[in-house]
């Protein structure tokens, strides 16, 4: 089959090709994702059985194929399934939009000085507002390139904002919601 993911930006990986117009991270195209998934199927790789994910190299080491980003806590995968999961009659499941394609951003961990300033304990995941804003910009850029409308799911799981529409991220999202083809 083919991945539902049209494009993936891993903000935490600095080793690959950056998305156009962005200064960090690695972008994965659908073609690259499908090639890696097919390679793993051909070699019998099962990422769940792999012990060390730190080198980001696929089990198909003779071709030195890079591994796709991993969803460490499963939150993004869970939300993607709700949004666009394929119908599974045996499990009585279907995502809200099973025929939808996905543009995915794996946010990077917030910088150490910010984690210390906000007293965020080690082991607790957090991200920076500017990285979220750039993630939204990336998703919109991909949708525009494809000429497709887009619905954005921002299931981050954390937000230090006032939740009153006054901070930068909230104002940015409000502005974008006024644009055509974005919801």
Question: How would you name each of these model-derived features?
Answer:
Residues 1-40, 64-130, 147-151, 161, ...:
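Subtilisin-like serine protease catalytic core
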Residues 41-52, 80-82, 89, 173-175:
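Catalytic cores of nucleotide-enabled group-transfer and carboxylate-activating enzymes in metabolic
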Residues 50, 58, 66:
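Conserved alpha-helical segments that form or flank metal/cofactor-binding pockets of metalloenzymes
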Residues 80, 133-136, 170:
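Extracytoplasmic/secreted envelope proteins and their assembly/folding machinery
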Residues 137-141, 149, 153:
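Subunit-assembly interface segments of extracellular/virion macromolecular structures
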Residues 157-183:
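Substrate-binding/specificity loop regions of serine endopeptidase catalytic domains
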């Amino acid at each position: 089959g083919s991945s539902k993911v049209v494009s993936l930006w891993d903000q935490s990986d600095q080793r690959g090709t950056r998305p156009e117009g962005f200064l960090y991270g690695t972008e994965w195209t659908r073609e690259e994702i499908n090639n890696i998934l097919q390679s793993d199927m051909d070699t019998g790789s099962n990422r769940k059985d792999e012990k060390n994910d730190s080198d980001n190299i696929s089990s198909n080491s003779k071709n030195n194929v890079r591994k796709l980003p991993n969803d460490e806590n499963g939150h993004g995968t869970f939300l993607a399934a709700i949004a666009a999961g394929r119908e599974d009659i045996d499990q009585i499941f279907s995502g809200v939009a099973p025929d939808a394609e996905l543009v995915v951003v794996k946010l990077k961990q917030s910088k150490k000085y910010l984690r210390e300033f906000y007293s965020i304990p080690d082991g607790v995941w957090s991200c920076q507002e500017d990285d979220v804003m750039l993630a939204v910009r990336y998703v919109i850029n991909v949708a525009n390139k494809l000429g497709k409308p887009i619905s954005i799911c921002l299931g981050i799981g954390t937000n230090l904002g006032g939740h009153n529409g006054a901070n930068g991220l909230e104002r940015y999202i409000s502005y974008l919601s006024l644009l055509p083809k974005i919801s």
